[in-house]
Amino acid sequence: MAMNLPPLAGSGGAHTQPSLPALPAHLQSDTHLTAHLASRFHLSLPTAQLSSHALISLNTYTSSSKGPDGGKEGSAMAGAEEMAERAWLRLGHRSENQAVVFLGESGSGKSTLRSHLLASLLNKSSTPLSTKVSLAAYVFDTLTTTKTATTPTASKAGLFYELQYDTASTTNPVLIGGKLLDHRLERSRIADVPTGERNFHVLYYLLAGTSPAEKAHLGLEDSAVQQRRWKYLGHPTQLKVGINDAEGFQVFKNALKKLEFPRSEIAEICQILASVLHIGQLEFESSANTQVTGDDSGGFSHEGATVVTAAKNKDVLAIIAAFLGVNAQDLQNTLSYKTKMIHKERVTVMLDPNGARSHANELARTIYSLLVTYIIESINQRLCAADDAVANTISIIDFPGFEQQASTKSALDQLLNNSATEALYNLTLQNFFDRKADMLENEEVSVAATSYFDNSDAVRGLLKPGNGLLSILDDQSRRHRTDIQFLESMRKRFEGKNPAITAGSSTAKLPGSNFLTENSAPIFTVKHFAGEVDYQVKGLTEENGEVISGDLLNMINSTKSEFVARLFGQDALQTVTHPKERSTVMQATISSKPMRTPSVMSRKTARTARNQRVLQQKAAEEELEKLSENNSQAGGAAKAAASEQGASGQFLAALDNVTKAVADPSTNSYFVFCLKPNDRRIASQFDSKCVRTQVQTFGIAEISQRLRSADFSLFLPFGEFLGLADAETILMGSERERVEMVVEDKRWPSNEVRIGSTGVFVSERCWMEIAHLSEASLAHGRFGLPSDGGDGLTPHGASPADPFAASKERLLSTGNTPLMYGEKGKNGYFGANDGSDSRSEAGVSAFGGGDMFKNFDTREQMAERGNEKSLVEVEEYRDSASRKRWLFMVYLLTWFIPDFLIRFIGRMPRKDVRMAWREKLAINLIIWLSCLLAAFFIVVFPMLICPRQHVYSAAELSAYDGSSGSPGAYVSIRGYVFDLEKFAPRHYPPNLVSTEDILEYAGKDATSLFPVQVSALCQGRAGSIDPAVLIDYRSTNVTGSPTLISQQDINANFHDFRYFTNDTRKDWYFQQMAMLRANYLKGRIGYSPKYMKTLARNSRTIVSMNGRVFDLTEYVVGGRRTVGEDGKDISGVAEDSYDFMEPDVVTLFRQLSGADATRHWASLNLSEQAKTRMLTCLNNLFYVGDVDTRSSVRCKFAEYLVLAISIMLVTIIAFKFFAALQFGTKNMPENLDKFIMCQIPAYTEDEDSLRRAIDSAARMHYDDKRKLLVVICDGMIVGQGNDRSTPRIVLDILGVSETVDPEPLSFESLGEGLKQHNMGKVYSGLYEVQGHIVPFLVVVKVGKPSEVSRPGNRGKRDSQMVIMRFLNRVHYNLAMSPLELEMYHQIRNIIGVNPTFYEFMFQIDADTVVAPDSATRMVSAFLDDTRLIAVCGETALTNAKSSFITMIQVYEYWISHNLTKAFESLFGSVTCLPGCFSMYRIRAAETGKPLFVSREIVEAYATIRVDTLHMKNLLHLGEDRYLTTLLLKFHNKYKTKYIFRAHAWTIAPDSWAVFMSQRRRWINSTVHNLIELIPMAQLCGFCCFSMRFIVFVDLLSTVLQPVTMAYIVYLIVMVIRSPDVVPVTAFILIAAVFGLQAIIFILRRKWEMIGWMVLYILAIPVFSFGLPLYSFWYMDDFNWGNTRVVAGEKGKKIIVTDEGKFDPASIPRKKWEEYQGEIWEAQTVRDDARSEVSGFSYATKGHPGVQVGVSEYGGYSRPGSIAGGFSGAHAMPPLPMNTSRMSLAASEMGGNRASQFGGSQYFSPEDMVGLPSDDALLAEIREILRTADLMTVTKKGIKQELERRFGVPLDAKRAYINSATEALLSGQL
């Protein structure tokens, strides 16, 4: 049949033809079609059609609603509406499911056309639900769209939007629901915003649209914003790109309200969005965590602090914690650590700042993704109809456009996005080329083949289930394979098999190298339909896992926010629980597929005419129901499998749902090809090359060619066709013939109709024509139901201007331009239908206006609620009497501080913390008071005894003569000393006497220059004196030094204003003296009592009263005269004026000359008025100075008191010096045969430190067979800078294969609540290093399955307790925990030494290196003195020169050992044995009595309740010192010593923060431990020679260190001020201290110590002043944990904790004999177990043919590390899963062991024939042991010797031989 195409429409030319297939054949090439599109584009006709199947739309970047005439006709909007009309008609008239698939690059306008299509479809519905469905789409776009370089509204999540209809009753479908299915949100964008792009719009909306009050609540204040850049929002310019974010936020909130979200939930959503923004603001830094906890572990380098990552901006952290409802500290800890699964082991990685930043990004991505999922699921719950009510659906499919380059750094997002685009394009090709091929063939209709680009290879390669690329990626990720392994797997799968996928090389040659190395940037290439794309392999498998750390989830489990709990309780969060602890979440992933699947495509109809379609739809329904069940069934195997799927697997499953739903036979699909006219987003510019590339990419020319030959959209059976055609009038012929007549009559083109054998294939146009649904009906919407407001989503009279996708588009505009999915008027999102849906207002009425947080809790209240803990009671106790007394004293000292001030100002809500603060304050007050008393005693007390006198003797005054070298220029006037040097420049008048002349009087008595008017200064006996009376003055200085100035001095006349002169000024002298005393007084002339007596003997009348000295000599000898006004002597002056002094006073002075007359003055028979007058006269006329008491006895006592203190201190130092003088030859000790354990606790040290410590211990010159390395790994932690966990590092060093994986066993630990239950793994074997082969035992604390963060970590003290408790139970024969039984087994049966044989415990830290002879020297000391219980050696620094901080510590370390510890060692009581280098006696040599592991010590050291300040300082600050205290306390008959010849080297803190924290620990620990020691009466010695006295001195010196520094400063000041002999002597004594120290290191030839001593002296202010004050004040700086004490009834105290209550019965315990008995009953002892007497076993070496020893616990023991050895796993059959464990019930202990270890065989009675009897065997065994070397004999060797002697195989007797050997060796037989 000839193809008759319709003529070109109109007469306007080819460009008026909208349908591309209608163009002539010669115009069907890519170039011609592009030209055709260009011609239409330039006429404002941006659309074209591919028949009725597809719409081609070009983005004009201006308006999507403007046609050529300015109206809607011809616009993209009109094209979308026409397609909506077609879908609507097909849905209503044929009850078919409809699907509209959008294809196009980013920026091509897909989102805009989608919104037009959706608006048009919703406009057809009369149901009020349509508004909500529209709003749901807006909410989805707000959450998932962003601005990119190509478009301001780029979709970043795949959308499958399903509109649900009931089509049963009418041809007008009824909208009954909607379903949003989101596919793979681009989560990587949250924390990685590409340059020039934005994050998701909602975050900007929140920032711009909230009110000031809301911003304040959310922490988004403008003032704060101006000072910071929001890291998650990209460059600040992205906040101002023409998008109306504020308006968008209001629309978003209103949309949520209309969708019935409660007001509180909308507010919570905003809080979560704000928390996402704040997470981006978090800044991290590496800091030293100086806050002490019980979990601290490690060596000296860890003692001061643990290097952790902390948040810089705590305020931001607090906001996030408040909104998430968690504790801020917990949040910081969670972000600083990350728990991972590495090789089936759960480890916690200590993150550096970059790692913490990544972890915070993970939290932000998780929160945002869950929020989006929650909102979408909540919308679906409100909109989605029940499946059985849905007849048909219209589905809108819009996935993000193809990406040539990843916009974010996520290769996974790019791969999945492009895979989806590939699948949708393949779906398009199938629809046009292959969909009806089978039906055409069955109907015997032939269609000419059309060539086209088939992307099936790429689709199969990417999406094929099982072995497609995404499936391979998912499989490799699930199996924890590396990226290179994934690349190799992909190569094996696709190389030579699929041309679309090419795997790159995994190796590469570095420049300048000829050797292949691993490729650092491997790629694989996929040939997509849109071009080749290279994908980075690096990090792809890890990213595909999308693992959310269990730390985050466990933190969220404690949230107090119900909303956050709901977010994390969604099914979208797929958790992985521990197989043995289902309540423990190990990790989780967020689903990359929707929570729901497409609805079942069914139609409720009973029309018999459509039975065939009904059957087809039922088949489709069954298929999709199976698909739905497989993806949604809860709790079954399918869900378990899904939970193991990674992102690619989940996305693949979801994409498969989409493609099957669209490709279903009952679904009619439409396609929208969106094209960009140019790449630069320039309006009205058509780039032919750009468009032609897109036309070629989508194969539009091939599709058009196909439609020219076969444009079939429907298949109508003959009967249905004839019914539609009203062909009843044609009565003749068969149905086929009648159909042919109708077709011929219609004259349809051959490409639109074909007649088959049973029906007719027709195009949609033909169907509409025959169904009387004319094309005109599409334009007028005749078959739709118009709303009362027009289209329902467009305002009345709105301008048709509809921005397409430019910066003015919809919500991006600020004026009257339309919003995003509807106009800004009342009929936009909130159109005319709003009022008809009462449900949509349910959430609105409650919302109100203004601040959405108005009735919300404040951030502070949220934070307080987040800090609350759920507590349970764990213990009840009463305070001791001493504790009560102490608390009474505390309150007595701190009563003035009210409790509420500590609570609110100090922010200490917990009572126990407040009490500790009070205790700290009380202790500080006591210390400060002690310091003040010491300072008072040293400084003030001497001054009280001898107050400082400002007096100068005559000789001293003469020294101040102003000459060069003199201290100054002083002059005396009537007993007062003045500063002449200061006065001379101010002499008045200045020109009369020169300054040089004035200074000539320096050092002299200038009294003669100042004549006095007697009557003005003295009232005499009568109350007045005649002014003519004069009195002479003569110096009392009989030696003549200072010289008395003559009265005839040339300058004397200038000061003479007496009565007889022309210029009389009677008060001039008094005034001048007052002025001089006020301004220039330096002191007084001093007369010692001795000098006064000398003067008296020289006929001087000189007396002292009240410390003042008066000289009446001139008065007594008559040195008075009277001079009148004319200057001549006169007579007749009254006697009482001439003899103006009372005779009694004169007599008193004569009689007491040279003595003190104070007491006699009081008894004078004179009136008080007379005494007052006489005293005035004495002070003004006869005063010559003060009594000089500086040489008195009390003043000498005060001076020598300082000297006495110095002598006492130096005496103690001298004793220490003599104690340190230990000389002798350095002899090498002999070889010793004592068994020692060397314990090394490991925490987060690096491999180098651990290797140095382990190797140094292994290489010690001590018999390798008699030392055991015991390494305790404190938790599964990866330290900063490490690539493996610490246990893995240790095991790698020791040579333990990763295949060796013993099962964890329970044991008791030191912790709060349930943390007392811990689990550990035990490894053992031989370690070979530099010729040494040393047995080792490794205990790895792995924690219970419920522990997520830092599993197993309990601290260094707990690590010590693992061994101490084990040995305690061994020696006391107590029941042991499963871990201890395993340790016993490994030591006794694998290593071959009975644990009781070990006599000494050698403890070193993991950062300590010991000298080769250290253990030998220590053991020698123990052997020399059986009363020695513990020793320590000298510890030096390995990092001495790394910083100034370490340099100042070198000398201090050396001197603290060689002076302090050596001195204490004299008394046998070293009070601090450092845990980094000490050895302890485990049991007494003679009696075997436990010492170091005695019951008292173990119980005291294992104290768990550490809730007081004192106990925390003892057990958390200095556990090593406290352990020493316990040894001295409970074993007071034994001694502790310092061995100066044993050496070790450790690492010291090299930063101030860590150094200060370490010293805070040491100082406070010292104080509290010494307080523990002082009450002990057992300390050796007597009186001051006792250690108790030295302990007291040590305590006092520790407390008074600040005063020591102040004392030194005081001495310096004294020397500067008065360099006399006393303070100089004190300095000499102090210098002697360092001199003695210098003698020690000089005698020991430690010359380098000279330099270190200088640095130490410079740092004395730090050591003696700064550190003690800092330490004392921060004595309570602990992490107090969650255990606290509350008041109970009747004075009892109740301990509560949030860690739960520990039940000791949860850890089963058995004695070793019981356990071994059960083992022996079930199996025979293995061949290669050695006698414990031999002390050494080679069973673990794993030589060929030798079975490796295996733990009776079911786990393999560690095979030896000897080269050529083999793993025990290969020597043994695999253990069954039901192997008995000690962690099970006690009744299960020892069960199921008969054949699980390969050790025993079963023999029939026939096997026993001909064998020797047991008695014969016993006799021979006894004979063999009598002559054999017990150090080399083995049980296997005994069996072989017996077989040789008896000549028969003795396998059947193996059990008896082994048990008999054991019994003989142990003495039981």
UniProtKB/Swiss-Prot annotation:
Segments traversing the membrane: 886-906, 925-945, 1201-1221, 1596-1616, 1622-1642, 1649-1669
Region Disordered: start-end pairs: 1-23, 593-612, 620-640
Q: What is its main location?
A: membrane
Domain annotation DEK-C: ranges? 1811-1866
The annotated phenotype of a deletion mutant is:
Leads to a winkled surface morphology. Impairs penetration in host plants and exhibits a significant reduced pathogenicity in Arabidopsis and cotton plants.
**Which UniProt keywords are present, listed alphabetically?**
Actin-binding, ATP-binding, Cell membrane, Glycoprotein, Glycosyltransferase, Membrane, Motor protein, Myosin, Nucleotide-binding, Transferase, Transmembrane, Transmembrane helix, Virulence
Q: Does the keyword Heme apply?
A: no
Q: Could you tell me which residue ranges the Cytochrome b5 heme-binding domain spans?
A: 949-1010
Please provide one cellular component term from the Gene Ontology annotations of this protein.
Answer: plasma membrane
Family annotation (Pfam families): Chitin_synth_2 (PF03142), Cyt-b5 (PF00173), DEK_C (PF08766), Myosin_head (PF00063)
Give the Myosin motor domain ranges. Answer: 1-778
The record's listing under Gene3D superfamilies reads: 1.10.10.820, 1.20.58.530, Cytochrome b5-like heme/steroid binding domain, Homeodomain-like, Kinesin motor domain, Myosin VI head, motor domain, U50 subdomain, Spore Coat Polysaccharide Biosynthesis Protein SpsA, Chain A
**Any idea of its EC number?**
2.4.1.16
The region called Actin-binding is annotated at 655-679
Q: What does this protein do?
A: Polymerizes chitin, a structural polymer of the cell wall and septum, by transferring the sugar moiety of UDP-GlcNAc to the non-reducing end of the growing chitin polymer. Plays a role in cell wall integrity and is involved in tolerance to hyperosmotic conditions. Required to successfully penetrate the host plants and thus plays a key role in pathogenicity.
- Tell me which PANTHER family the record gives: CHITIN SYNTHASE
* The name this protein goes by in its record: Chitin synthase 6
